[in-house]
Amino acid sequence: MRAKPATVASMLDYDTSAIYTFLRMRIPGLLSTEGAVGIGWKRGGVMVAGAVFEQHNGRTVWAHVAIDAPLSRRFLRAFLDYPFAVCAVDALRGYVLASNTRLRALARRLGAVEEAVLAGAARDGGDVVVCTLWRGNLKHDTLAQH
């Protein structure tokens, strides 16, 4: 009988430094912020999604997000639980390139609104959208218990 090959499971990763490295490869110019908290998702030992939360002020926390592969429910739950259950903020905010239609669509599916457009603010001269997910607008069922 042949043994099954070993597989590396998908898993959450909380190494903020490694998550910043993943994000910087996708968000040129991203700077580290002291006290930031990272949540990543590895598949087969490779980071495929990551978020870093920073500038928590009691009401809002900002996130930098990059996603290379379809999201797992477990990563999404951790991503949403951190700001709303752990930090207990009213709003999660992030800057999204206007050209990143995939991330903007995901934000809208979760209940986020596009609060502002920063014309010409992107490195390439494109626009940047400020997306805000208010606790009361959250459409994802993973926080039903909160």
Language-model-derived ranges and their functions:
Residues 1-29:
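Short amphipathic alpha-helix that is part of the acyltransferase structural core
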Residues 95, 113-128:
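Conserved catalytic-core motifs of GNAT/GCN5-like acyltransferases
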Residues 121-146:
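C-terminal "cap" of GNAT-fold acetyltransferases
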